[in-house]
Amino acid sequence: MAPNIRKSHPLLKTINNSLIDLPTPPNISTWWNFGSLLGICLMAQIITGLLLATHYTADSTLAFTSVSHTCRNVQYGWLIRNLHANGASMFFICIYLHIGRGLYYGSYLYKETWNTGVLLLLALMATAFVGYVLPWGQMSFWGATVITNLFSAVPYIGQTLVEWAWGGFSVDNPTLTRFFALHFLLPFIIAALTLVHLAFLHESGSNNPLGIPSSCDKIPFHPYYTMKDILGLMFMLTPLMTLALFSPNMLGDPENFTPANPLVTPPHIKPEWYFLFAYAILRSIPNKLGGVLALAASVLILLLMPFLHKSKQRTMTFRPLSQILFWMLIANLLILTWIGSQPVEDPFIIIGQLASITYFTLILVLLPMASTLENKLLKY
């Protein structure tokens, strides 16, 4: 019989072992769809981003106009821009659900895969932040000013660091130029990290909802999970297209329709919705350095997850106490997201502070305690 080129060719063999003949647990649920959706999001963002970059001018006097020109005069420019802007939202929805799945099912116990995943999240957040600055509207400009200014909280070298990042004494043309360069570069770094992430994942194989080894009865990835992932893709594409075609500006800020003006500060400076939970934690601490540390900790706490796992079972499938705390954590994050979008006024300040304390308490104290208690309950 002639050798199958899919299994013998040096390059196709790698693709085959990663996407076609990959041994996969037979019982992984729809929660395992998000990895492939994130890959599709990344490809879509790189393609739409490249097309937008061909019409974009990274200059503070022309950036706003060039984006406007893309939407008005370029064939389907409006669609490409709307898909790119709302594609970022879909990217974050998928990555947050992907992380939530990892937390619920104990996937973080694959430490290397988990750590590269956290690096991917940080790279994605950096990409989204520098990308938001490029249209050079009011919120772009002031968002860049506020967030880059946080680096000035670093003791001793803070101010120098900020001025080095700005390329001057304020956010200006050099800042925009370098942000464009970074926004172009970072997605390719994300793509490279994704390959590392997958390499580590394929070392151990996928986890599954029961959290038990499934080596004895794995099934090939294709056709079973390729079909399942295409269904997931349809479910993601529907809201994305609905958003991009019917209400493309729903998730954006109206302030960004005004060109950047360093002399006028918007009444409420706030980032895009996917950063609001972290922004709420940042604002809930009345000290600059403390706020910056809490902001960093809110994301970097994910790196501690493997060390906070105290249960004898891997997943939360059969752990009702941990389940309750997990969903409390999700609700808490939604509250933080809401608070981040509100002005710094009376009821919101205290709610934000309580939600921030609850966030860290749930992860660092209550979940490990519940796991230990559940271990004891197993004996009775």
UniProtKB/Swiss-Prot annotation:
Residues passing through the membrane, by range: 34-54, 78-99, 114-134, 179-199, 227-247, 289-309, 321-341, 348-368
Reported cofactor(s): heme b
Principal cellular location given in the protein's record: mitochondrion
One GO BP: mitochondrial electron transport, ubiquinol to cytochrome c
Superkingdom, taxonomy of origin: Eukaryota
Annotated Gene Ontology cellular component terms: mitochondrial inner membrane; respiratory chain complex III
InterPro entries: Cyt_b/b6_C (IPR005798), Cyt_b/b6_C_sf (IPR036150), Cyt_b/b6_N (IPR005797), Cytb/b6-like_sf (IPR027387), Cytochrome_b (IPR030689), Cytochrome_b_C_euk/bac (IPR048260), Cytochrome_b_N_euk/bac (IPR048259), Di-haem_cyt_TM (IPR016174)
Topology of the protein relative to the lipid bilayer: Multi-pass membrane protein
Residues noted as binding heme b b562 in the record, renumbered to the chain: 84, 183
Complex formation: The cytochrome bc1 complex contains 11 subunits: 3 respiratory subunits (MT-CYB, CYC1 and UQCRFS1), 2 core proteins (UQCRC1 and UQCRC2) and 6 low-molecular weight proteins (UQCRH/QCR6, UQCRB/QCR7, UQCRQ/QCR8, UQCR10/QCR9, UQCR11/QCR10 and a cleavage product of UQCRFS1). This cytochrome bc1 complex then forms a dimer.
Protein family membership: Belongs to the cytochrome b family.
Protein name (record): Cytochrome b
